[in-house]
Amino acid sequence: VYKRQSLYFMNLDKTKNEIIETAEKIFADTECGKVFRIKGFLMDDDDKWMELNVTHQEMRLEPITEGQKVVIVIGENLNEQRIGTFFA
């Protein structure tokens, strides 16, 4: 029996495009575990806050007024060490 997990990655020094590419790579890598969703907040190229929501079906980026630099990976049997290498 697997339990749902959440892994938090704070204060990432990555661009919007780098975070999007990282999310796609994590979903594609089965060694990361069973990833359901990646969500978080990031700044775009114009220093405006964006909310990120990624699932296997869709990726959404929406503007928001405030946020903090965090990406959360949600799933089961997550390999924290493997996922962490994508954010290094």
What spans do the regions from the language model cover?
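Short, small-residue-biased leader/transition segments that mark boundaries at the very start
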Residues: V1-Y2
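Short beta-strand-to-loop capping motifs
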Residues: Y8-K14, D44, V73-N77
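Polybasic interaction patches
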Residues: L12-K14, A23-T30, V35
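Poly-acidic low-complexity segments
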Residues: T15-I20, N79
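Short amphipathic alpha-helices in soluble, non-transmembrane regions
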Residues: I19-I26, I83-A88
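Short, structured protein-protein interaction patches enriched in aromatics and acidic/basic residues
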Residues: E31-T55
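Generic C-terminus detector
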Residues: W49, N53-A88
